[in-house]
Amino acid sequence: MRVRGHVLTVDQPRPDGGKDTAPTPVELFVASVASCTTHYAGRYLDRHGLSRDGPAVRADFRMADDRPPRVASLSLTVDAPSLPAERLAALRAVVSHCTVSNTLADAPDMRVHVRCEPEPAEMPQAVEHGHVEAARHARQTGTECPR
């Protein structure tokens, strides 16, 4: 997968048909929330002239027991050992509203379109300018275009 020229590798565990060479899409989703939280924490610390040494974000998640498959709960813990106690509430407020967290709190409209072109182009998955395009060759997905 390519994102703004960067290459991300995504895979599945062996029991799920993958080779377990990279994180799963769900793990990348959770990492996205954690990294957004980390970014906002860093910006807060920088803005207030506080040390960035030591802050870390841990993300724990649980999958739903019922269908459809989805993340049922997500818990983030921000460790900021050098943060003065009087700034804890402010940091919590800032990191609770990172862009990814805001998106989860107010879910976007999501539509999935399936297209079939006469000759599907082999194209890597890409995220560009807020637009996601993904295509795979029909032989790779097992789908065939009507002729």
Task: List the model feature ranges, each with a label.
Residues M1-A31, A41-R147:
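Extended beta-strand/beta-hairpin segments
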Residues C36-T37:
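Alpha-helical metal-binding/catalytic segments enriched in His/Glu/Asp
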